[in-house]
From Swiss-Prot:
<dbReference type="GO" id="GO:0034599">
    <property type="term" value="P:cellular response to oxidative stress"/>
</dbReference>
<dbReference type="InterPro" id="IPR007457">
    <property type="entry name" value="Fe_traffick_prot_YggX"/>
</dbReference>
<keyword id="KW-0408">Iron</keyword>
<comment type="function">
    <text>Could be a mediator in iron transactions between iron acquisition and iron-requiring processes, such as synthesis and/or repair of Fe-S clusters in biosynthetic enzymes.</text>
</comment>
<dbReference type="InterPro" id="IPR036766">
    <property type="entry name" value="Fe_traffick_prot_YggX_sf"/>
</dbReference>
<dbReference type="GO" id="GO:0005829">
    <property type="term" value="C:cytosol"/>
</dbReference>
<protein>
    <recommendedName>
        <fullName>Probable Fe(2+)-trafficking protein</fullName>
    </recommendedName>
</protein>
<comment type="similarity">
    <text>Belongs to the Fe(2+)-trafficking protein family.</text>
</comment>
<dbReference type="GO" id="GO:0005506">
    <property type="term" value="F:iron ion binding"/>
</dbReference>
<dbReference type="Pfam" id="PF04362">
    <property type="entry name" value="Iron_traffic"/>
</dbReference>
């Protein structure tokens, strides 16, 4: 049986993550407050950011940038600036 959380990103009840996917306090906050659906959306954005900005994930500055973008997207509702990407119209 899956666990349900009130997803802060989607503002609705949804299936929660099966386990903590990110380390530390931020990882706990994500596990407790973000749904599988929102996490999957973030992973797509993350991949586009890494590719578009040519981030080297071995560099601490790149990891810090990505973490800041992740927090803004998941908890503040801010879309990351991905050059050349036009979101689909609803």
């Amino acid at each position: 049986m899956s666990r349900t959380v009130f997803c802060q990103h989607l503002n609705k009840e949804a299936d929660g993550l099966d386990f903590q996917l990110y380390p530390g306090e931020l990882g706990k906050k994500i596990f407790d407050n973000i749904s599988k659906e929102a996490w999957t959306e973030w992973q797509k954005k993350q991949t586009m950011l890494i590719n578009e900005k040519k981030l080297n994930m071995m560099e601490p500055t790149a990891r810090n940038f990505l973490e800041t973008q992740m927090q803004a997207y998941l908890f503040e509702g801010k879309e990351p600036d991905i050059e050349g990407y036009v979101p689909p119209k609803s």
